[in-house]
Protein backbone atom coordinates (compact mmCIF):
# COMPACT_ATOMS: atom_id res chain seq x y z
CA UNK A 1 0.00 0.00 0.00
CA UNK A 2 0.84 3.61 -0.24
CA UNK A 3 1.53 5.97 2.65
CA UNK A 4 -2.20 6.49 3.21
CA UNK A 5 -2.47 2.82 4.22
CA UNK A 6 0.32 2.92 6.83
CA UNK A 7 -1.86 3.98 9.80
CA UNK A 8 -4.44 1.25 9.07
CA UNK A 9 -1.74 -1.41 8.69
CA UNK A 10 -0.07 -0.32 11.91
CA UNK A 11 -3.36 -0.34 13.83
CA UNK A 12 -4.26 -3.81 12.52
CA UNK A 13 -0.83 -5.05 13.60
CA UNK A 14 -1.32 -3.54 17.05
CA UNK A 15 -4.71 -5.24 17.39
CA UNK A 16 -3.23 -8.56 16.25
CA UNK A 17 -0.07 -8.64 18.35
CA UNK A 18 -0.93 -6.52 21.42
CA UNK A 19 -4.43 -7.75 22.20
CA UNK A 20 -3.59 -8.08 25.89
CA UNK A 21 -2.63 -4.40 26.20
CA UNK A 22 -5.01 -1.44 26.41
CA UNK A 23 -5.42 0.40 23.12
CA UNK A 24 -4.33 3.57 24.91
CA UNK A 25 -0.78 2.12 24.86
CA UNK A 26 -0.73 2.31 21.05
CA UNK A 27 1.64 5.13 20.09
CA UNK A 28 0.43 5.54 16.51
CA UNK A 29 3.94 5.24 15.07
CA UNK A 30 3.67 3.52 11.70
CA UNK A 31 7.21 4.20 10.48
CA UNK A 32 8.01 0.49 10.94
CA UNK A 33 5.64 -0.35 8.08
CA UNK A 34 7.28 2.14 5.72
CA UNK A 35 10.60 0.55 6.70
CA UNK A 36 9.21 -2.92 5.97
CA UNK A 37 8.16 -1.81 2.50
CA UNK A 38 11.66 -0.51 1.79
CA UNK A 39 13.18 -3.99 2.23
CA UNK A 40 14.79 -5.32 -0.97
CA UNK A 41 12.53 -8.39 -1.17
CA UNK A 42 9.26 -6.58 -0.40
CA UNK A 43 6.64 -6.91 -3.13
CA UNK A 44 3.26 -5.23 -2.98
CA UNK A 45 1.64 -8.19 -4.75
CA UNK A 46 2.68 -10.41 -1.82
CA UNK A 47 1.26 -8.09 0.84
CA UNK A 48 -2.22 -9.54 1.25
CA UNK A 49 -4.98 -8.01 3.38
CA UNK A 50 -8.56 -8.95 4.24
CA UNK A 51 -10.91 -6.07 4.93
CA UNK A 52 -13.73 -6.05 7.44
CA UNK A 53 -17.20 -4.86 6.37
CA UNK A 54 -16.40 -1.41 7.80
CA UNK A 55 -13.32 -1.16 5.57
CA UNK A 56 -10.77 -1.64 8.33
CA UNK A 57 -7.98 -4.17 7.88
CA UNK A 58 -9.01 -7.39 9.61
CA UNK A 59 -6.08 -9.65 8.61
CA UNK A 60 -2.79 -9.40 6.77
CA UNK A 61 0.01 -11.56 5.39
CA UNK A 62 3.28 -10.04 4.17
CA UNK A 63 5.66 -12.34 2.33
CA UNK A 64 9.15 -11.64 1.00
CA UNK A 65 10.10 -13.54 -2.15
CA UNK A 66 13.49 -14.03 -3.81
CA UNK A 67 13.18 -14.71 -7.54
CA UNK A 68 16.72 -16.08 -7.78
CA UNK A 69 16.36 -18.83 -5.15
CA UNK A 70 12.59 -19.15 -5.67
CA UNK A 71 12.31 -19.02 -1.87
CA UNK A 72 9.99 -17.01 0.34
CA UNK A 73 9.56 -16.15 3.98
CA UNK A 74 6.38 -15.12 5.74
CA UNK A 75 7.29 -11.88 7.47
CA UNK A 76 4.00 -10.92 9.11
CA UNK A 77 0.76 -12.83 9.44
CA UNK A 78 -1.82 -11.43 11.78
CA UNK A 79 -5.49 -11.00 12.49
CA UNK A 80 -6.90 -8.09 14.49
CA UNK A 81 -8.20 -9.50 17.78
CA UNK A 82 -11.82 -8.61 17.07
CA UNK A 83 -11.69 -10.84 13.98
CA UNK A 84 -10.05 -13.92 15.52
CA UNK A 85 -11.44 -17.41 14.92
CA UNK A 86 -13.07 -16.56 11.59
CA UNK A 87 -10.50 -18.20 9.32
CA UNK A 88 -9.05 -14.89 8.12
CA UNK A 89 -5.44 -15.73 8.99
CA UNK A 90 -5.72 -18.93 7.02
CA UNK A 91 -7.39 -17.10 4.14
CA UNK A 92 -4.73 -14.40 3.74
CA UNK A 93 -1.87 -16.85 4.14
CA UNK A 94 -3.41 -19.31 1.68
CA UNK A 95 -3.84 -16.49 -0.83
CA UNK A 96 -0.21 -15.47 -0.35
CA UNK A 97 0.94 -19.05 -0.93
CA UNK A 98 -1.25 -19.29 -4.03
CA UNK A 99 0.48 -16.20 -5.41
CA UNK A 100 3.89 -17.68 -4.59
CA UNK A 101 3.04 -20.87 -6.43
CA UNK A 102 2.11 -18.83 -9.51
CA UNK A 103 5.54 -17.16 -9.31
CA UNK A 104 7.30 -20.54 -9.27
CA UNK A 105 8.23 -20.52 -5.60
CA UNK A 106 9.64 -23.85 -4.42
CA UNK A 107 10.24 -23.21 -0.71
CA UNK A 108 8.57 -21.13 1.98
CA UNK A 109 10.03 -20.48 5.41
CA UNK A 110 7.75 -19.59 8.30
CA UNK A 111 8.40 -19.23 11.98
CA UNK A 112 6.13 -18.60 14.92
CA UNK A 113 6.71 -17.73 18.54
CA UNK A 114 3.25 -18.52 19.87
CA UNK A 115 1.09 -21.61 19.61
CA UNK A 116 -1.84 -20.10 17.66
CA UNK A 117 0.48 -18.92 14.88
CA UNK A 118 2.41 -22.17 14.93
CA UNK A 119 -0.82 -24.16 14.61
CA UNK A 120 -1.91 -21.94 11.70
CA UNK A 121 1.38 -22.47 9.86
CA UNK A 122 1.32 -26.22 10.44
CA UNK A 123 -2.24 -26.54 9.15
CA UNK A 124 -1.66 -24.48 6.02
CA UNK A 125 1.77 -25.78 5.10
CA UNK A 126 0.54 -29.33 5.61
CA UNK A 127 -2.21 -28.66 3.09
CA UNK A 128 0.39 -27.27 0.69
CA UNK A 129 2.24 -30.62 0.85
CA UNK A 130 5.42 -29.24 2.35
CA UNK A 131 7.78 -32.07 3.12
CA UNK A 132 10.46 -30.43 5.24
CA UNK A 133 9.52 -29.31 8.71
CA UNK A 134 12.18 -27.96 11.01
CA UNK A 135 11.60 -27.84 14.72
CA UNK A 136 14.08 -26.45 17.22
CA UNK A 137 13.57 -28.01 20.62
CA UNK A 138 14.71 -25.77 23.45
Q: Can you name each region flagged by the protein language model?
A:
Residues 93, 114-117:
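Short glycine/proline-centered loop/turn elements that form peptide/ligand docking sites
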Residues 58-59, 89, 130:
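A structural microfeature
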Residues 109-111, 126-138:
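Conserved catalytic-core motifs of GNAT/GCN5-like acyltransferases
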Residues 20-79:
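A conserved beta-strand-loop-helix scaffold within acyl/acetyltransferase catalytic domains
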Residues 100-113:
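Conserved GNAT acetyl-CoA-binding A-motif
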Amino acid sequence: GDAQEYPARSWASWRAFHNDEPDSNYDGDYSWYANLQSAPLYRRDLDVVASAPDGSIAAFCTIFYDDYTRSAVTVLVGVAAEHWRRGLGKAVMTEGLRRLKALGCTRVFSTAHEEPADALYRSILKEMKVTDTWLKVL
